[in-house]
Amino acid sequence: MAKAFIGVGSNIDREENIRAALKALCKSFSAVVASKVYESSSVGFEGDNFFNLVVGIETELSPRELQDRLHEIEADYGRSRGGPRYVSRTLDLDLLLYGDMVVDEEDLQIPREDVTRFAFVLRPLSELAGDDCHPVSGKSYAKMWQEFADEEQKLWPVNFNLLSQAD
């Protein structure tokens, strides 16, 4: 079994879609754990605020199979691919990490660059895997969050536990 981390986000019917995503992830994978949920402004476009969190899972799927399964879940909840990258989303499920694997292919990058670029990914990841180390930099995610320097990316914790409501 491999430990993987998935970034989860939505800015369309956020609560409903995040809950649905968590239900689908709990049905598909074992040892599902979730970070706190954060609200953040959209990045790269003008749009409604997002809810974001990171989910840890254990899986026997390969990274490619896992990415394909995440795309299936997104499609089940109205996500269409092939359009502009920065747009409002019903559901966004991104494979962030897969064990300590490093993959750099056209349509699959592990670790996902978002881990080092966006507060809405790094902060919740540091909650779940703070002592784990980035497979390229070797720094712990807690240390990376402590050193994160982008003051423009504001996050607000959402005051409820979505995982318990997803069961």
Predicted region positions:
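Short beta-strand-to-loop capping motifs
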Residues: 8-10, 55-61, 97-100
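Short, surface-exposed acidic-centric catalytic microdomains
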Residues: 20-66
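Short N-terminal binding/cap micro-motifs at the start of the first secondary-structure element
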Residues: 13-16
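Flexible, gly/pro- and Lys/Arg-enriched active-site loops
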Residues: 44-50, 64-67, 72-167
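Extreme N-terminal starter segment of soluble prokaryotic enzymes
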Residues: 1-5
